UniProtKB/Swiss-Prot annotation:
GO terms for molecular function: GTP binding; GTP cyclohydrolase II activity; zinc ion binding. The active site is at 127 (proton acceptor), 129 (nucleophile). GTP binds at residues 50-54, 71, 93-95, 115, 150, 155. Keywords: GTP-binding, Hydrolase, Metal-binding, Nucleotide-binding, Riboflavin biosynthesis, Zinc. One of its GO terms (cellular component) is cytosol. It comes from Aeromonas hydrophila subsp. hydrophila (strain ATCC 7966 / DSM 30187 / BCRC 13018 / CCUG 14551 / JCM 1027 / KCTC 2358 / NCIMB 9240 / NCTC 8049). This is GTP cyclohydrolase-2. The lineage of its organism: Bacteria, Pseudomonadati, Pseudomonadota, Gammaproteobacteria, Aeromonadales. One of its GO terms (biological process) is riboflavin biosynthetic process. Belongs to the GTP cyclohydrolase II family. Binds 1 zinc ion per subunit. InterPro entries: GTP_cyclohydro_II (IPR032677), RibA (IPR000926), RibA-like_sf (IPR036144).
């Protein structure tokens, strides 16, 4: 049984071209998630894709504390240039701890904690995201394999474990700045994210 149900589709014009916006609902929680699709993503050829976890602060409020908004824009640009691809927008804010806890974690980071220490101090694991829903979304979209835009090896392993082969990792290193340097270094050192030196 799938963890998500495809609920609705519409066109979504963006600065990079027109995507199909696909809405999904988690069967257990009712939480909604979205996919942006361009071109025909069915078939055997690997699809350029990104699994993007919701980041209100980076995606909508232009925060420089993270690289999320920069990665979101770059991923959509890359898909548009390719003419074919999918971006999953997964509602797992703050690596799964939610917006209010993310703000609490930011407060701890303001006092010197790194992103992992802040989550742990609040009683959470470093990363609480569940990638089962991502695999189920991709399967309902008939994606058979990915060229995954990510720096996170956990996303690649998760897709492989759920039967979505990752044919290629496409690095997505965007938006490094003085405000997120410590954050990105922590992701590399404690969460095994892959960044060029």
């Amino acid at each position: 049984m799938s963890s998500v149900t495809l609920v609705a589709k519409s066109k979504l014009p963006t600065p990079w071209g027109t995507f199909t916006l696909v809405g999904f609902q988690e069967t257990g929680t009712g939480k909604d998630h979205a996919a942006l699709v361009m071109g025909d993503i069915t078939g055997d050829e690997p699809v350029l894709g990104r699994i993007h976890s919701e980041c209100l602060t980076g995606d909508a409020l232009f925060s420089l504390r993270c690289d999320c908004g920069f990665q979101l824009q770059a991923a959509l640009e890359n898909i548009a240039k390719a003419g074919r691809g999918v971006l999953l927008y997964v509602r797992q804010e703050g690596r799964g701890i939610g917006l209010l806890n993310k703000i609490r974690a930011y407060h701890l980071q303001d006092q010197g904690a790194d992103t992992v220490e802040a989550n742990v101090a609040l009683g959470f694991a470093a990363d609480m995201r569940d990638y089962t829903i991502c695999a189920d979304m991709l399967k309902q979209l008939e994606v058979k394999s990915l060229k995954l835009m990510t720096n996170n090896p956990r996303k690649m392993k998760a897709m492989e474990s759920f039967g979505i082969p990752v044919a290629e990792r496409v690095p997505l290193q965007e938006g490094r700045n003085p405000h997120n340097e410590f954050y990105l270094s922590t992701k590399a050192n404690k969460l095994d994210h892959m960044f060029k030196k």
